[in-house]
Regions:
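Hydrophobic/aromatic residues in alpha-helical transmembrane segments
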Residues: 63-67, 115, 146-147, 225-226
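Aromatic- and glycine-rich beta-strand/loop motifs that create alpha-glucan
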Residues: 1-21
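Long, hydrophobic alpha-helical segments
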Residues: 53-73, 108
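Terminal transmembrane helical anchor/hairpin motif
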Residues: 164, 168-229
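Secretory targeting signals
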Residues: 35-37, 48, 58, 100-159, ...
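Hydrophobic alpha-helical transmembrane segments of multi-pass membrane transport/permease proteins
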Residues: 19-38, 54-63, 167-171
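Transmembrane helix boundary and interhelical loop/hinge segments in multi-pass membrane proteins
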Residues: 47-48, 66-84, 98
C-alpha cells in the first residue's frame, strides 16, 4: 500500500505540473460554460442533459491526451524498467496511473458542478437526473481511462497511443448505428458494446444495473490487460 501511495503521489505531481492538465481544464470549462449559457438564457433549459452529452463527446477527445503518455512515455525514457525493478509491481503501477488520471477528470466534473448550482439559483431542477448523469460520466471516464492506459501500455509512442485510444473510443461511440444492420443475435451483441447506448439512461435520469456493470467490466478488463501487457513487455 505504501509503495502504491508513493507511485500515486509521483503520478499526481507529474500530471499537475504539466500545463496540459490546466489547458484541458480551461478548454473544458470554456466550452461547457458557453453551451450552458446558450441553453439557460436562450433555450431556457433547466436541465443538464444536453451538457452531459457534450461532456461525453469531450471525454472521447480529451482522455486520449491525458492517457497517451502514462506508460508510453515511461517506455520511451526507459524509466519503466526502473519502476519494475523496484519493489513496485505492475498492478501498483497501473492503478496509480489510473487513479491519478481519474483525479483530473473528477476535478473537471466537480468544477462543472457550478452549472448545477446556477440551475438551483434560477429554478428548481430535478436533482435525480443530475446525480445520475454525473455518476454516468464518472463510470464512462473510468472505462475510457482504462482503455487509454491499455493502448499506452502497448507502445512507446505517445501519438500512436493517443490515436489508438481515440479510434477505439469513436468506434465504440458509433458502433450501435451499424449494429442494427446486423442479423439477430449479432445486432444486440454489437449494440450492447456501444458507449453511448449505456450512457443515455444515466443522462436522462435512469439507472440500470446492466449499464453500471458494463462500464465497470470495461474498466476492470482494460486495467487487467494493461497489467498483463506491462508484465509481458
Amino acid at each position: 500500500m505504501r509503495r502504491f501511495l508513493v507511485l500515486l503521489v509521483k503520478e499526481e505531481r507529474a500530471l499537475f505540473s504539466s500545463p496540459i492538465a490546466y489547458v484541458l481544464i480551461a478548454v473544458f470549462l470554456l466550452i461547457m460554460g458557453y453551451s450552458f449559457t446558450l441553453a439557460l438564457f436562450i433555450s431556457h433549459s433547466m436541465t443538464l442533459v444536453h451538457l452531459f452529452f457534450q461532456i461525453f463527446v469531450l471525454f472521447l477527445l480529451t482522455v486520449p491526451i491525458i492517457t497517451m503518455r502514462l506508460i508510453a512515455e515511461e517506455r520511451k525514457l526507459r524509466t519503466i524498467e526502473v519502476l519494475l525493478t523496484s519493489r513496485a509491481n505492475e498492478t501498483q503501477i497501473v492503478f496509480a496511473k489510473f487513479v491519478a488520471s481519474m483525479s483530473l477528470i473528477v476535478l473537471m466534473l466537480i468544477l462543472s458542478g457550478a452549472y448545477a448550482i446556477v440551475l438551483a439559483i434560477y429554478g428548481d431542477p430535478d436533482w435525480g437526473p443530475i446525480f445520475s448523469g454525473y455518476l454516468g460520466l464518472v463510470l464512462l471516464a473510468a472505462a475510457l481511462v482504462g482503455v487509454g492506459l491499455l493502448t499506452s501500455s502497448l507502445t512507446s509512442n505517445q501519438i500512436i497511443a493517443a490515436l489508438l485510444s481515440l479510434s477505439a473510443f469513436l468506434l465504440l461511440w458509433i458502433i450501435d448505428e451499424y449494429g442494427y444492420l446486423l442479423p439477430d443475435p449479432f445486432d444486440s451483441l454489437v449494440v450492447n458494446m456501444s458507449l453511448s447506448v449505456h450512457f443515455k439512461p444515466f443522462a436522462t435520469g435512469s439507472m440500470y444495473l446492466s449499464d453500471v456493470a458494463f462500464y465497470l467490466s470495461a474498466t476492470m478488463l482494460s486495467l487487467f490487460l494493461s497489467v498483463r501487457a506491462l508484465a509481458w513487455r
